[in-house]
Each structure stands twice: as C-alpha cells, then as structure tokens.
C-alpha cells in the first residue's frame, strides 16, 4: 500500500445515506501516524489561508491583502476579472522548522531555489507559499538581497492574476517584467505609488532593478526574450525584464510605449526575432541594450501617484474571521499544494493522515479521490469520488474524473443493443458530467467526455444532445481534441450538416497536419450530402454553418 508506512488497506467502510464504500486503513504502528498540525485558518472570497505565523502577523497580512485588492480595483480593475474555480491556497510559513522547505518543488527547475516564495498553478487551482522566516535571499556568490515576505507575496499574487488573464500564454519576459513592476507598488489608504524606482527620497527599495543590475552585464536580448525564457530564470534575469518593461512604459518621455505595444501584439502571432524587434523599435538588440544600460545607471522615469482628497481615502478592510484550522483543512490544503509541487508521496501521506484519524469532509474526500486517480489507483479513487459526489461536493474535476471511472466500468459491461450502452448506463456516466458542466471552471474535457459517451449509446442522440457538445465547441473553439469528438459524434450519429461544419472548422484551427487531413477527409465525405441548392431571387442562401453552431 503506497502512502504512510505502517498503513494497510482493509475491508470497506459504509457511510450513511446511499451505500458508498470507502477504503478503510488500519494503523499498524501508531508511531508512524503523525499528530495533527497546528495551523490558523481564514477564508476570503477566492482564497483559503493556512498560517503558521503569529495571530497578529496573520491579521496584518490579511488586512494588507484586502487593501491591495482594493488598490488593484482602483488602478487596474481588469486584473481582478476572472473565475477562481477552486479557492487559491495561501500558505504562510513561520519560524524555523515550520514548513517552507517541505513545499519546495521536487523538480527545482520549476521555481528558482533560494527564494522566499513559491507559486504553483494548474488549469484547476493555484497555490502561493510565503516564507516569513527568511532574512536574506542569496543571489549567487556574495550577493544577497533582503527578504521581504510582503513583496514576495505581491509578486506571486500578481503572477497569479496575470496568468489568469493571459491564460498562461504571456511570454516569460513580459510576465516577469509586469510582475516585478506591479510588485513594487506602494500603498496605504491615502496614497498609491506605481512605477517608482527608489523611495522618493534618494534611497533604494528592495527589488529595484537599478540596484540589482548596477554591477552586472546586460543579458543578450535574444536570450532574455526567448519564447520559453532562459535556461535559468535568475533574479538578475527578472531584474532585466523589469528594467526593459519599465523603460518601455515609463522611461525617458514615454518614447518606447507605442513600439512596445506593437511588439507585444505581434508576438501573439509571430515568434520573437531581432528582425521583428527592429521593425517595432527601429533598433537592433545591441543598440537597445546600450540604451537600457544607460537607463539602468541613470533612471529618468515617470511615476504614477494617486493621493486621496480629505474624506475620500480607501475604506478600512473589514476584519477577517480566523480560527484554528481543522485537521481535514490542514491535510487537504497542504496535501494539494505538495501535489502541485510534484511531491506525490508527501502529498498522499498528508492527505490520508486526517482520513485515517476519522475525518470525512467532502472536500477532503474529493482531494483524496483526485490524488488516487492521478496515482493510477482507480478503485480507491472511485470510492473516494463516489462518496464526495454523494455529499454534493462543489468541485467540477471530481465529477469529471468520477464520470471517467464510471465510463471505464460500464463500457466493459454494455447492456444495450449492439454492445452499446443502455439508458441506465448512459445516465450513470452523464449525471456527474452534467453536474461538472454547471460548476466552474468550464472544462473542454467535460464536453469531450459527453460526446464520447453519446457515441457509445445504443439510443441515437437527439439534436438537443448534440447541442450540449456544440456548447463546448463554442467555449473552446481551438480545442482540436474536443472538436474531433464533436465532429465524429455528428458524423456517426446522423447529423451531416453539423459534421461538415465542424470538420471545416477543424481544418481552420488545427495546427497539426495530421489533424487537418483527418478533418478535411470528414468534410469531403459530407460535401455532397449537404451541398445547398442554388439560391433563387426569392430565396435566401443557406447559412454556411447550421444554426446550432451560431452564437446566440
């Protein structure tokens, strides 16, 4: 049995309500089951906070975070748009032996080692881990930087916001430059300072690029602007990205703003190159690097300030209730953050410990089910996910993975005509999928699995059933896997007009030649069947796409 040493799987456990079998674990050696950990817990919209710093410092952090959100709403409201399907975990680690190191990723190349913050993100959820105990960050050699946990958090939080807005597609240098620019924002209820280098009184601030790069050579622009970033994303690379973005947006008469915007826009369709750079900035990499060197040494720039008039300052953030974290909350949040960092064994052990101690919170059961599914333990995953679904857990991926497991089960025992699925089997698979469809975030895989399930049905799907799959195509118009599922369903189950339209769309959006050829063959197969009659003066030509593909 993988997981905590000294545990063995036993017979199933029956819980109240519908008969749901759960794995049961027995502790062979009680010394191997760690005691519950003492953490503080707080919740604000979209975030769960797990803290091992003092109560006073935790309250200060939450006030600062809420005030930061208000500041962003005032000066950059677009950054706050977007859904957070699963609350983002904020883990605040305290003094020695209180946990930051245990969250370091298994693959140290994912995030640079030696910092006081970690950021993890998947399509479903994110996590930020902050070290409040570290005094200095070692940059290499004898170079050190004062560790500021608040600035580290601002950087991680803005990274989270930027990736949510750009769907993780921003060039690494662009994301890093914006992250460092935003993280340097200073604010209180009466004053907001943005894009300022230095403290305004002749002294430097932590993270200022001119201090970081004063004695450093400029990294070649081709390396800095690489589409996947440099091989090592050092603090000095981050500082140069910050310098480049700051110079373009706020330096020397704002002369580089328009070229910078053109460059970023064209990168949406073109790979970075010196030719593209010259077309936008009218300078070579080397020429611009020389300018940037001068800007680093003599930073003449425009800052942005907001000062509230008397009686119009930002409101005081409301107090956030805080309490001792429940065992299942510690296990679930820590376990999932460890899993995000690739620490799969530690994640499983952390998740299973509160379960062994008797915790049955639905969110813990869902997390355990997803963990077991990711580890390939489908039988245990199904039991945990069935129990979580029975308790009406609010997590879309739990229902998606449960539907996958149910489909795998019923397809080997098909009871319908022609070896297809009967109505009861279809309902068993589609029920969790339609629950997932109602929950955030929308997932292409949900619609793809709906299409796959209908393709195995003994009963022919109706137009309204195909319409649900088309709904997914509208939401994810460039997802070729979903588009292929929808096309094949329409082609095989008697919807030639929709099959042709979907296949033609697939030809347009597919990037792989093999996918394009497959879509092209399907479209050609239906060409004669759906070829419209020539329009007469009294007739309107047929739409190029059936109504079902049109946006409402």
What role is predicted for each listed range?
Residues 341, 375, 409, 423, ...:
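Structural motif corresponding to the intra-repeat A-B loop/turn of tetratricopeptide repeats
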Residues 10-27, 33-171, 186-189, 215, ...:
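Juxtacatalytic substrate-recognition/specificity segment
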Residues 421-435, 491, 496-514:
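TPR/TPR-like (Sel1-like) alpha-helical repeat modules
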Residues 16, 268-414, 441-442, 498, ...:
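Beta/coil-rich, acidic/histidine-enriched accessory regions frequently appended to metallopeptidases
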Residues 353-354, 387-388, 435-436, 471-472, ...:
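Canonical positions in the second alpha-helix
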Residues 35, 110-135, 148, 166-318:
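Acidic/His/Gly-enriched intrinsically disordered linker/tail segments
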Residues 404-435, 456:
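Short coil/linker segments at helix-helix boundaries
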């Amino acid at each position: 049995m993988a997981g905590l040493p000294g545990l063995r799987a036993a017979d199933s456990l029956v819980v109240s309500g519908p008969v749901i079998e759960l794995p049961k674990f027995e502790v062979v050696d009680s010394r191997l089951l760690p005691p519950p950990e003492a953490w503080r817990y707080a919740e604000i919209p979209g975030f769960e906070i797990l803290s091992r710093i003092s109560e006073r410092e935790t309250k200060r952090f939450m006030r600062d975070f809420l005030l930061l959100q208000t500041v962003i709403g005032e000066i950059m409201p677009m950054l706050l748009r977007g859904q957070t399907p699963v609350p983002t975990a904020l883990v605040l680690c305290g003094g020695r032996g209180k946990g930051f190191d245990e969250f370091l990723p298994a693959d140290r190349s994912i995030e640079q080692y030696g910092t006081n913050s970690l950021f993890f993100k998947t399509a479903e959820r994110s996590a930020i881990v902050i070290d409040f105990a570290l005094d200095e960050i070692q940059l290499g050699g004898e170079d050190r930087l004062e560790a500021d946990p608040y600035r580290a958090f601002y950087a991680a939080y803005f990274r989270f916001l930027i990736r949510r807005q750009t769907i993780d597609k921003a060039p690494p240098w662009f994301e890093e430059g914006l992250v460092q620019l935003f993280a340097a924002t200073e604010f209180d209820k009466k004053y907001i300072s943005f894009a300022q280098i230095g403290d305004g009184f002749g002294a430097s601030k932590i993270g200022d690029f001119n201090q970081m790069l004063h004695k450093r050579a400029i990294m070649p622009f081709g390396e800095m602007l690489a589409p996947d970033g440099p091989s090592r994303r050092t603090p000095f690379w981050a500082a140069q990205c910050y310098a480049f973005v700051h110079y373009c947006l706020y330096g020397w008469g704002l002369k580089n703003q328009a070229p910078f915007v053109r460059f970023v826009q064209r990168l949406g369709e073109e790979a970075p190159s010196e030719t593209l750079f010259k077309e936008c900035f009218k300078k070579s990499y080397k020429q611009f690097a020389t300018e940037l060197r001068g800007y680093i040494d003599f930073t003449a720039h425009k800052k942005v300030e907001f000062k509230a008039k008397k009686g119009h300052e930002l409101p005081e953030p409301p107090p956030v209730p805080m309490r001792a974290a429940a065992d299942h909350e510690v296990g679930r949040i820590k376990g999932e953050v460890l899993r995000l960092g690739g620490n799969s064994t530690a994640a499983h052990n952390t998740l299973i410990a509160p379960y062994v101690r008797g915790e049955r919170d639905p969110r813990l059961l869902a997390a355990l089910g997803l963990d077991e599914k990711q580890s390939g333990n489908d039988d245990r995953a199904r039991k945990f996910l069935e129990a979580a679904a029975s308790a009406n857990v609010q997590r879309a991926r739990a229902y998606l993975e449960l539907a996958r497991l149910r489909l795998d089960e019923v397809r080997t025992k098909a009871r319908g005509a022609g070896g297809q699925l009967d109505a009861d089997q279809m309902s068993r698979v589609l029920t969790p999928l339609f629950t997932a469809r109602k929950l955030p975030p929308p997932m292409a895989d949900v619609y793809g699995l709906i299409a796959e399930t209908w393709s195995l049905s003994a009963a022919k799907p109706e137009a309204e059933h195909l319409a649900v799959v088309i709904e997914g195509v509208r939401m994810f118009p460039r997802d070729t896997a979903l588009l292929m599922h929808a096309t094949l369903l329409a082609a095989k189950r008697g919807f030639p007009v929709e099959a042709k339209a979907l296949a033609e769309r697939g030809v347009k959006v597919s990037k792989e030649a093999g996918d394009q050829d497959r879509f092209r063959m399907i479209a050609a197969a239906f060409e004669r069947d759906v070829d419209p009659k020539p329009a007469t003066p009294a007739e309107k030509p047929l739409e190029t796409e059936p109504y079902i593909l049109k946006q409402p």
